[in-house]
Amino acid sequence: LSVFFIGFSFAANDTSSSISGSVNVPGATITVEHVPTGSTKSSAANDSGNFNFSGLRPGGPYVITASAAGFNTERVDNVYLTLAESNSFDVVLVSSTAIEDVVVTGVRSGISSSGPGSTITADDIALTASIDKGIGDFLKRDSRFAIQGTFRDVQISALGSNNRYNNFTIDGVAANDPLGLNANGFASVRNPISVETLAQIRVDFAPYSVTKGNFGGANINAVTKSGTNELEGKVYGYDTDQTNVGDVLGAPVNQFSDETKGFVVGGPIIEDKLFFFVGYEESERFSPSNSQPIAAEDEAELLQIKDFLMQRYNYDAGWPIFNAPPESQEQTLVKLDYSINDNHRVEYIYQDTQDINIREYDRPNLNYVFSSHYYVYPIDREKNTFAYIGDISDDLSVEMKYTDIVYKNDQDSLGGENFGHHRITLSSGEYAYPTSEQYLSLIHI
């Protein structure tokens, strides 16, 4: 089967935050400054004293100032914004002729939520213990999630629903399994995004927002980090193997090893204007084959089968004792943020995830599977996103996003694509599978 499809996205989940509130002086000037990048937005409160800022970067810190003629300027420091939520503040200005030692500050009145949900910040991720640095380890901070399995077998259930009922997005763009071939429901075999590159994860279970839909379990929106005026980064690595796993009911743990390493770096290209953020991560997991030892009475017949296929069809069937190469993944993220002016900014995000996994056809125990019966299960997902966030006027704000996604899954038998599937019964009654996988697909989406 060969399928080719290129996906374009024009609608997506929110990737920004907003600030709203009121001030006791209509017409007062409200200024919001994002300290890490130096970007600012200013607006005058309306006749009712209300103000609103949208399209802001999640996180912070922000500084909010309010000023008006004849009044002392008030300032609120260390404001941190929640992804896809409106953060509310009430500010009281005091006449400049009032007693000097009276101090009045802005008061945070709360967060206007779009429904039941939770937010996981980069600090939460850094402080949470995790075996495989998988998304599920951090989502289970919310008790409405149930997590089963690890690595590529992880299943994330929200409110008791099937894990495929979730909608998972990265920077507002869907990253779900388009074909239903991955047990985890993601568009990748392992983690769909390195958690070291995430700024916040927003989870919604029953939102009343037109921007959130296409799910029956949870809407999980992960937003990546951006560069700031500070050049900073880190190199990291972690690994585990069977010696770090406790016995389950006294049963031995099969041998395995899993290693992850990578780096992240971000900073300014042009101070206060243009910023970059780059992340790279590679993972490798190895588990020895569970091939059974070859019984003495079967070895001669297996060798005879191998020789026959080579002499008659020039087909190399391999051998039943086979250790597949390690399962591997490479992830690359490049993000550029450009502040055109105080009211307009654009983003470009490039993400590429490549998985390679060698699998064998499911079989009953006590059967011999030749190496030619294994197949390569590769996934390559490349995404380019262009976004515009701006204020057209005091009453109109716009967020536009265009995404191009190319998804490839070219499955290929190690024994080649032009030799059919066969099962051979040995004299001992056991089966031998010396030929290619019976299911094969070449998929481009």
Predicted regions mapped to residue ranges:
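Transmembrane beta-strands of outer-membrane beta-barrel pores
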Residues: P207, G237-T243, E282-F286, D352-I356, ...
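Periplasm-facing N-terminal accessory domains of Gram-negative outer-membrane beta-barrel systems
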Residues: F10-V103
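Periplasmic N-terminal accessory/gating domains of Gram-negative outer-membrane beta-barrel systems
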Residues: N46, N72, D77-D90, D101-S226, ...
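Extracytoplasmic loops and strand-loop junctions of Gram-negative outer membrane beta-barrel proteins
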Residues: T121, A183-A187, R202-D204, G246-L249, ...
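Transmembrane beta-barrel wall of Gram-negative outer-membrane proteins
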Residues: E232, N254-I356, I379-V398
